[in-house]
Amino acid sequence: MTNNTKTITLNLGPQHPATHGVLRLILEMDGEIVNNADPHIGLLHRGTEKLIEHKTYLQAIPYFDRLDYVSPMCQEHAFALAVESLLECEVPRRAQFIRVLFSELTRILNHTLNIGSQALDIGATTPLLWLFEEREKIMEFYERVSGSRMHSNYFRPGGVAEDLPDGLLEDIDKFIDQFPPKLHDIESLLNENRLWKQRLVDIGVVSQKEAMDWGFSGPMLRGSGIAWDLRKSNPYDVYDEMEFEVPIGKNGDCYDRYFVRMLEMYESIKIIKQCIEKMPKGAVKTNDPKLTPPTRAKMKESMEAMIHHFKLYTAGYDVPAGETYKAVEAPKGEFGVYLYSQGVNIPYRCRIKSPGFAHLQGLDFMSKGHLMADVITIIATLDIVFGEIDR
């Protein structure tokens, strides 16, 4: 007796809400079982790397907010570190603490969205509503410090744009005190929930070897049991002064990756607490006039200061010739910036390494043999944002 069954081809996205952006996924299905998953990218390509080649180093910063628009400050951080490496400039300690503080707030901002939307994709509505309430508070901190809720444009080569407004540290401290009980509530809904575990446990398993071979990083790598975190292995700013653990999983499945992200938020809370306690006084920008604009008070008194300000924001500053690569531990994984300077005021090349690009490549082998519904779970646990994948 011959088997006359044939596979069907199914197009998922790019308009489907569960694809988390403009992912077009071509699935080869044998009934409900996935044989192959072919992701098509590029629908959000905006030529960011090429655009940066025609902007000064200051004008390039806002482009990084628009890559992974869920965790903008972490990407600004990588670019600022790369420019500082070429300039060999000292960053004031207060600015370093502020950067680390907001990088960890950004990590919470990212993970709350991921866990909430992952729960919604699987059918649980409550976690998304609860977590969005907490995200709103963090976005208010963004707005108070930078004037914008999402595209902050706050980090600068040599420091940050402005000092923290009065009362902000106290409000962040209050938020951090009330946030852990909210996380406990989410855990009580999900951790031992029978339906949640049935949808996540043993789904999308990634072994340690596969995670390394595919170039995974962040929670995708740590979920497979590899304790690799750039904040520990290659610390930047004041991360070497912070005490925190690196959560890892055991089985490398969707449940482990969910749990790693949940535990990372508790570690971020520890780091934020330490930043608030240790926050020094002092300047938030380097005192190099080539990099730092004059104050508004000076501009009202001095024509030279006004000219200096105008030149800084139009012509920018020359960066010494050379090349560098700097990476940060962004919420989704290793976000890196390769900069090549020819000694002028615009970069000759700015290559961006986004973690989601490598993670999406692994979707095919992670999905094979699973049900169609499991593909949605795997996409959610990849934590992909197409701003950074398509660039």
Curated annotation (Swiss-Prot):
Q: Which residues form the signal peptide?
A: none
According to the lineage, what is the superkingdom?
Bacteria
Q: What Gene3D superfamilies does the record point to?
A: Cytochrome-c3 Hydrogenase, chain B
Q: Which UniProt keywords apply?
A: Cell inner membrane, Cell membrane, Membrane, NAD, Quinone, Translocase, Transport, Ubiquinone
Q: Where are the transmembrane segments?
A: none
Question: Where in the cell?
Answer: Cell inner membrane
Reactions catalysed, semicolon-separated, are:
a quinone + NADH + 5 H(+)(in) = a quinol + NAD(+) + 4 H(+)(out)
Does the record's keyword annotation contain Cell inner membrane?
Answer: yes
Report a single Gene Ontology molecular function. Answer: NAD binding
Q: Which SUPFAM superfamilies does the protein's record reference? A: HydB/Nqo4-like
The record describes its membrane topology as: Peripheral membrane protein
Question: Which Pfam families does UniProt cross-reference here?
Answer: Complex1_49kDa
GO CC terms on record? plasma membrane
- Record has Mitochondrion as a keyword: no
- EC number(s) given by UniProt: 7.1.1.-
Record-stated family: Belongs to the complex I 49 kDa subunit family.
**What HAMAP family would the database entry show?**
NDH1_NuoD
Q: State the function annotated in the UniProt record.
A: NDH-1 shuttles electrons from NADH, via FMN and iron-sulfur (Fe-S) centers, to quinones in the respiratory chain. The immediate electron acceptor for the enzyme in this species is believed to be ubiquinone. Couples the redox reaction to proton translocation (for every two electrons transferred, four hydrogen ions are translocated across the cytoplasmic membrane), and thus conserves the redox energy in a proton gradient.
Q: How does it assemble?
A: NDH-1 is composed of 14 different subunits. Subunits NuoB, C, D, E, F, and G constitute the peripheral sector of the complex.
Q: What's this protein's name? A: NADH-quinone oxidoreductase subunit D
Instruction: Kindly list the organism's lineage.
Output: Bacteria, Pseudomonadati, Pseudomonadota, Alphaproteobacteria, Rickettsiales
